[in-house]
């Protein structure tokens, strides 16, 4: 018996691809069950379950990397009917990006045609894309990026008390006006203005963002990729932290110390010194009193 695709079949394989189907086991060998659905045969590896000839089995129908019709009991993260997240596994500049959507021995391609024109904004390995599956007239399965309206429909509204929170976001749209992101843990949308980033993030890139406000009209969050002002004092703050560590966690200098003593020890002005101390105190790294400054 032939169990592979038949050129002369009268059934519609296209309609079954990338969907959940129920078929009947009609044959088996040592490695696989063979499941019939509307005149088509799908292979189900025996490693996925214990069945017998005559059993009805429900699973996800697809063609594997070898081009063979297959059924899996593993639930994919995306189907033809439902969007889901996929993880980028590979990038081909001539074809697009490959996604893992939890289908055994199968990655899904998101075509170059729907990716950003600037290839430096393409997703990289490990990035996340929100897709549903589509099947072309050659029965090939592709990943279809979610439209912006899809994110608007599924996302909730921002709360009033989110100012200055650090959150996790994923870029779902790049425009000249800025980066549009989805916050999966919060089910909210956000926007990063070009002034609030050092470089443009990739489509699908995961980001650590900070809330700086929200739009009243639609309750989407305004976000920043830039650190708080006191977190940007890298050189001076690090200088003080290093000195404190070398002195066993305490130094006799604090914000009331003489400018000359500060300059002689740290080679920075008293203004720089006080600003760095203030930032470190806000971060909870030090405390000050009349005896000096102590590491926490």
Enumerate the predicted regions with their spans.
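Single-stranded RNA-binding regions, centering on S1/OB-family and related RNA-binding modules
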Residues: 2-296
């Amino acid at each position: 018996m032939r169990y592979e695709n038949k050129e002369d079949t009268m059934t519609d394989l296209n309609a079954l691809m990338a969907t959940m189907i129920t078929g009947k086991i009609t044959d088996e060998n040592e490695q696989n069950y063979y499941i019939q659905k509307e005149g088509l045969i799908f292979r189900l590896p025996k490693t996925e379950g214990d069945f017998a000839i005559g059993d009805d089995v429900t699973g996800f129908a697809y063609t594997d990397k070898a081009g063979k019709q297959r059924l899996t009991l593993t639930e994919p993260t995306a189907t033809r009917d439902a969007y889901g997240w996929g993880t980028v596994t590979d990038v081909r500049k001539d074809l697009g990006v490959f996604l893992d959507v939890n289908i055994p021995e199968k990655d899904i391609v998101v075509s170059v045609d729907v990716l950003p024109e600037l290839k430096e904004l393409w997703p990289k390995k490990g990035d996340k894309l929100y897709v549903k599956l589509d099947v072309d007239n050659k029965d090939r399965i592709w990943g279809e990026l979610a439209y912006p309206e899809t994110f608007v429909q599924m996302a909730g509204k921002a709360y009033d008390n989110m100012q200055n929170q650090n959150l996790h976001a994923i870029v779902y749209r790049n425009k000249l006006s800025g980066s549009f992101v989805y916050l999966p843990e919060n089910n909210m949308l956000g926007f990063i203005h070009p002034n609030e980033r050092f470089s443009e993030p990739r489509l699908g890139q995961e980001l650590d963002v900070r809330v700086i406000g929200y739009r009243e009209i639609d309750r989407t969050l305004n976000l920043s990729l830039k650190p708080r002002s006191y977190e940007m004092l890298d050189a001076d703050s690090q200088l003080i932290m290093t000195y404190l560590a070398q002195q066993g966690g305490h130094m006799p200098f604090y914000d009331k110390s003489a400018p000359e003593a500060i300059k002689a020890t740290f080679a920075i002005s008293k203004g720089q010194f006080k600003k760095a101390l203030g930032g470190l105190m806000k971060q909870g790294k030090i405390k000050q009193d009349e005896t000096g400054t102590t590491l926490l």
